């Protein structure tokens, strides 16, 4: 096995430790529907049914409403809490009457703590849409969890090990560079060597995953502080959304898709005051104001703040 392959393998192990703790929500209920206008739905059943891990859920071009009352376990009370749900659908999450965020194929986790006060009971109301075309049809092995019909893998209240998460982000960036032919071969060879050396500092056989701090310090000192491969100029990270009003979905679904997009950007703005975002279509502002006035007011405050 080449050093870079050994690094890749251990990077997969490292990602398993992002969550410090995970507590499964076991009382979820689901009701399937089909959207017939911007805010009207035709339900397939008269009532909700239980949603358990391993169940098939969602339908092509289908909507699902998911709910649960969750008592936060004592061992998690007072901690920074996250909600985790792996899904191929696009889900807007409301907790105790407030839209808190969203999950989708690109983000399985959303922060809860600043938005739930100190309440020990959380009422989840979720609305999800799954488009008519699989999210990733290139990989047949993933269709069971990323297709139009998918296997429910569970929903969790979690705590995050931020040291591990930060290290994962650093490795993700550097591994992408090391595998890209857009960068010169000397730099890529340097990265493959030093990423392997950094990963060697982590003891994956220890109960507490020893070596995280040492690995991070090695990356900071040897890779990020290295002047031999530095270029000139600044890098700007810019977020923009030009939402396809109709693509692999109908126009009426753009109302909820836009809500999720806006929610995710608002939460990034909450966390990163320097984060700026542009949303360029009048139609999506109009539907947000019409159907989700509370979120629209929150958006207006961000506009006032220059975000």
What are these regions (language model features)?
Residues 63-69, 80-82, 121-123:
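Intrinsic-disorder/low-complexity, polar/charged segments enriched in Ser/Thr/Lys/Arg/Asp/Glu/Gln
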Residues 2-44, 54, 88-90, 116-307:
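Catalytic-domain carbohydrate-binding cleft regions of carbohydrate-active enzymes
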Residues 61-63, 105-106, 117-121:
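Solvent-exposed, conformationally flexible loop/turn segments
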Residues 75-95, 124:
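Aromatic-lined ligand-binding clefts that engage carbohydrates, nucleic acids, or primary amines
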Residues 54-74:
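Short beta-strands within extracellular/lumenal beta-sheet-rich domains
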Residues 44, 52, 88, 92-111:
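Solvent-exposed beta-strand/loop surfaces of large extracellular or lumenal domains
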Residues 74, 112-117:
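Short, flexible loop/turn segments at beta-strand junctions in immunoglobulin-like
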